[in-house]
Amino acid sequence: MASTVRPSFSLGNETLKVPLALFALNRQRLCERLRKNGAVQAASAVVLQGGEEMQRYCTDTSIIFRQESFFHWAFGVVESGCYGVIDVDTGKSTLFVPRLPDSYATWMGKIHSKEYFKEKYAVDDVQYTDEIASVLTSRNPSVLLTLRGVNTDSGSVCREASFEGISKFNVNNTILHPEIVECRVFKTDMELEVLRYTNRISSEAHREVMKAVKVGMKEYEMESLFQHYCYSRGGMRHTSYTCICCSGENAAVLHYGHAGAPNDRTIKDGDICLFDMGGEYYCFASDITCSFPANGKFTEDQKAIYEAVLRSCRTVMSTMKPGVWWPDMHRLADRIHLEELARIGLLSGSVDAMLQVHLGAVFMPHGLGHFLGLDVHDVGGYPEGVERIDEPGLRSLRTARHLEPGMVLTVEPGIYFIDHLLDQALADPAQACFFNQEVLQRFRNFGGVRIEEDVVVTDSGMELLTCVPRTVEEIEACMAGCDKASVPFSGQK
C-alpha cells in the first residue's frame, strides 16, 4: 500500500513542517505564467541550476552551504550540485542529483538512491547530473529556458544553468527571469505560513535580547543570544543577513556589524540600542529591527525620537492597501519625521518647504522598505516599466511598485543623526535654515532609531507578521522582566 504521508521539511522538535507541496505549487504557477507568454514555444523546458559547495579561499574548509534562491523556490532542495528541469506543457519535474563516489560514504555519510530523492522532494523523476544532456535529448524539448537577469538590489547577474552538451540545444535566456521573478513577488498561503514562522521565532529572540541586555555587555553578546535562540528554538542555522547590533553612536551606522565594525562596542549607560536581526528557516527570511534604551528606561530625548519613528511606522502600515504607491509611503514617513523633529524644536519652518529640499533624507537616507521572501532583499522591486526615482532617499528605495495582495514587505522608517549628512546639510543654505543648531547639538552623539516590521499586503490592507514590544511602555515592561504579550497592531486607523 502506498504511503499517505505527505513529504515535508522539518528539523524536528517544535520546528515548522513545511510541505513540499509548496514547491510543486510554485512550479505549477511558473508553468501557468509561461504558457500565457506568447514567446514561449510548445514543448519548452525550464532548466535551473542549484548552488554549489564553496571553500574558504584556497583551502579545503567548506563554507556552510545555503541553496540558491531561485532553485530553492522551485524545488526546495537543500543539497548542493543539483539541477532541475520542468516541462512547461505538462508541469512534470525532474531533479538531477550528483552521482557520488564511494568515498562519499566514508567521509560524508550514506549515499542515497534516486528513489530517496524522488520521495523526499515529491518530484516526478530523479536522474543523475551526468545524464542531463542525454535525458533532455531523449525528451527533445523545443527550447531550454534558462535563467539570466540582473538583481536590481545588487546589480549582479544571476547564474545561468550550464552543463556539458548544452550547446546542442536551442536555449533562450531572456524569457524565464522576469516570469519567475514575478512569481516570487507574490507569496502563496503556504509561503506565508513559513514567513509567519520566521517572524514568530525571530520576534521571540528579539524579546529575549531585550530582557537580557545590560550595561557593560558587548554588542556581540546580544548577537550571540539572538542566534542561539533562533537555532535552538527555531532550527535556524542561518540568519537572513549579518546581524546589526548597534549601541550609542553606532546606531547611526546603517549597516554596522561588518568585519571592520563587528558588533564589538561595550554597551554604556544612556545608550540607545538598535538591533536589526532576522532568522532564516529553510531559506525563508525575516528582517526585524528593535530600538530600545540600554538601561531599560527611555530618556525624554530618546522617547521623543522613538515615538516619532513609531508614529511614522504605524501611519504607513495603516495606509497600506492594494493600489498604494510605495514611494508615497516613503514620502509620508519623511513628512511625519520632519513634523516630529519640528515639534521637539530641532527644526523650524514649513514642513512642505523642508520636503522640497529633501531634508527628510538627511535623517532617513535609506528606503522605507523592501520585498521579503527567500532573500532578505527579495527580487522583483524594479521590473520592466518601473523606474527608480532619482531623488535623495527615494533613490535608495528597493521598489517603486504599487502594492498588490500577496506582496511581503518590510516597513522600516528611521531617524538617524549621521554627522556626515548633518554637516552636509548645515553647509547647504537651502537646508541649514531649518535647523536649530543648539537643539541639534544635543543629538549629535545620539545614534539613531529604526523600527522594522514585516508585513503582507492583503485585499483590504495589511497583516503584520512581526510581534515584538513596540510602544515605550511595552518595551520598558519587557526589559523589566514583565513577559506579557505585546498588543498586536492591527493597522486600523
From Swiss-Prot:
Cofactor binding: number and manner: Binds 2 manganese ions per subunit.
Keywords: Acetylation, Collagen degradation, Dipeptidase, Hydrolase, Manganese, Metal-binding, Metalloprotease, Phosphoprotein, Protease
Cofactor(s) needed for function: Mn(2+)
Entries under InterPro entries matching the protein: Aminopep_P_N, Creatin/AminoP/Spt16_N, Creatinase/aminopeptidase-like, Pept_M24, Peptidase_M24B_aminopep-P_CS, X-Pro_dipept-like
Entries under Pfam families matching the protein: AMP_N (PF05195), Peptidase_M24 (PF00557)
Regions that span the bilayer: none
PROSITE patterns assigned: PROLINE_PEPTIDASE
GO biological process, one term: negative regulation of programmed cell death
SUPFAM superfamilies in alphabetical order: Creatinase/aminopeptidase (SSF55920), Creatinase/prolidase N-terminal domain (SSF53092)
GO MF, one annotated term: proline dipeptidase activity
Binding residues annotated for a dipeptide, in chain numbering: 255, 287, 377, 398
Disulfide bridge map: none
CDD domains in the record: Prolidase
Phosphoserine: modified positions: 167
Binding-site residues for Mn(2+) 2, renumbered to this chain: 287, 370, 412, 452
Residues binding Mn(2+) 1: 276, 287, 452
Protein EC: 3.4.13.9
Gene3D superfamilies the UniProt entry points to: Creatinase/methionine aminopeptidase superfamily, Creatinase/prolidase N-terminal domain
Catalytic activity annotation: Xaa-L-Pro dipeptide + H2O = an L-alpha-amino acid + L-proline
Modified residues (N-acetylalanine): 2
Enzyme class: hydrolase
Similarity comment: family membership: Belongs to the peptidase M24B family. Eukaryotic-type prolidase subfamily.
Subunit details: Homodimer.
Purpose: Dipeptidase that catalyzes the hydrolysis of dipeptides with a prolyl (Xaa-Pro) or hydroxyprolyl residue in the C-terminal position. The preferred dipeptide substrate is Gly-Pro, but other Xaa-Pro dipeptides, such as Ala-Pro, Met-Pro, Phe-Pro, Val-Pro and Leu-Pro, can be cleaved. Plays an important role in collagen metabolism because the high level of iminoacids in collagen.
Protein's UniProt name: Xaa-Pro dipeptidase
Lineage: Eukaryota, Metazoa, Chordata, Craniata, Vertebrata
